[in-house]
From Swiss-Prot:
Pfam families: FBPase (PF00316), FBPase_C (PF18913)
Gene3D superfamilies the record matches: 3.40.190.80, Fructose-1,6-Bisphosphatase, subunit A, domain 1
Name of this chain's protein: Fructose-1,6-bisphosphatase class 1
InterPro entries tied to this protein: FBPase_C_dom, FBPase_class-1, FBPase_N, FBPtase, Fructose_bisphosphatase_AS
Native organism: Methylorubrum extorquens (strain PA1) (Methylobacterium extorquens)
Binding site for substrate: D114, G115, S116, S117, N204
Reaction(s) catalysed by this chain's protein: beta-D-fructose 1,6-bisphosphate + H2O = beta-D-fructose 6-phosphate + phosphate
Record family assignment: Belongs to the FBPase class 1 family.
One Gene Ontology CC term in the entry: cytosol
Cofactor note text: Binds 2 magnesium ions per subunit.
Subunit and interaction comment: Homotetramer.
Binding-site residues, Mg(2+) 1: E92, D111, L113
Length: 348
């Protein structure tokens, strides 16, 4: 149902719980995350006045060097989740699953600070999260080693010129913008619908020499524009923050690619399944888009470990399907042979 623009995130969550009472705990958890996001937004907005947010510290679970803002965001979201009905948290900034409230019904996977390379230069950063039901048993990891289809909600926050909170509880994807006059997230984009086709793609083109043939062929054909097999010109965008590219795709369509490649450690791409690709896939699908890993639907993947990586292609359905055709040989580029045997964005 269409909601009035300017209605609050709290109003939306109340309506979702009225529609489906079983979402009450999920809604409470989203409220906690939104409150923490407002605090993080304040810190980001102060920039260097808040200290050296780009100062480097220890390495996180994935080998990335933690920056000061990574640690600040992690601590603030963990504090918020301690007050929510959450039993376990899988965070990019923690090696192991963190246990909060034994017996609580939910588990949260979170990237507290997406786009860390943008810290300190005034560019967009964000937060990504996915909420799942707890899997009973003694293994705290078990709740996360389930398909992305088990998520009860997913969302991301963009800390940019405006702070936006993008969320789905399985009933469409909506964007709420932080109203600085009263620190309330208010609806600005209701029931998002990604256009099925758009002439814009996002990829880190500096890695072209490492890409597999299908990715190279797809991008080459886009670059050939109206004179090539795609019969139209394309624009390229890349922000180094997944949340910013995802929000752009939600609003005006296009496709995002982060494939696996032949660099050491990048065979499965760089993004993490639990707290990056699965939440984004849920949001994109709820807005009518597509999200794959090159072999199949992201939401059907089951992680074998907490920090498992996954290739990612998402966006307008026609363009996501087009990328897939380059892998299964249905879309050989002009002057090239079909790419037999290339069945996925994941390298063996």
């Amino acid at each position: 149902m269409t909601k009035p623009y300017g209605s609050s995130l709290d109003d939306h969550l109340d309506a979702e719980v009225a529609r489906e009472p079983s979402l009450a705990d999920t809604a409470a958890t989203i409220r906690a995350l939104a409150a923490a996001a407002i605090d993080v937004s304040e810190t980001v907005g102060r920039g260097s006045l808040a200290g050296d947010l780009a100062a480097q510290g220890e390495h996180n679970s994935d080998g990335d060097v933690q920056k000061a803002l990574d640690v600040i965001a992690h601590k603030r979201f963990m504090q918020a989740l301690e007050e929510a009905p959450v039993a376990q948290v899988a965070s990019e900034e923690a090696e192991d699953v963190v246990t909060l409230k034994a017996g609580a019904p939910l588990a949260v996977a979170i990237d507290p600070l997406d786009g860390s390379s943008n810290i300190g230069v005034g560019m967009v950063v964000g937060t990504i999260f996915g909420i799942r039901p707890v899997t009973p048993g003694e293994d705290p990891n078990a709740s996360f080693l389930t398909p992305g289809t088990t998520q009860t909600a997913a969302g991301f926050v963009v800390y940019g010129p405006a702070t936006t909170f993008v969320v789905t509880l399985g009933n469409g994807t909506r964007i709420f913008t932080l109203d600085r006059t009263d620190n309330v997230f208010r609806l600005t984009h209701d029931a998002m619908k990604i256009v099925p086709s758009a002439s814009e793609y996002a990829i880190n083109a500096s890695n072209v020499r490492h890409w597999d043939g299908p990715v190279k062929s797809y991008i080459e054909d886009c670059l050939r524009g109206s004179e090539g097999p795609r019969d139209r010109d394309f624009n390229m965008r890349w922000t180094a923050a997944l949340v910013a590219d995802a929000q752009r795709v939600l609003i005006r369509g296009g496709v995002f690619l982060y494939p696996g490649d032949n660099r050491k450690g990048y065979a499965q791409g760089r993004l993490r399944l639990l707290y990056e690709t699965a939440p984004i896939a849920f949001l994109i699908e709820q807005a009518g888009g597509g999200a794959t890993d090159g072999q199949g639907r992201i939401l059907e993947r089951v992680a074998a470990k907490i920090h498992e990586r996954s290739p990612l292609v998402f966006g307008s359905t026609e363009e996501v399907e087009c990328v897939g055709k380059y892998y299964d040989g249905r879309q050989p580029s002009a002057g090239r042979s079909p790419l037999f045997g290339q069945r996925g964005l994941m390298r063996s």
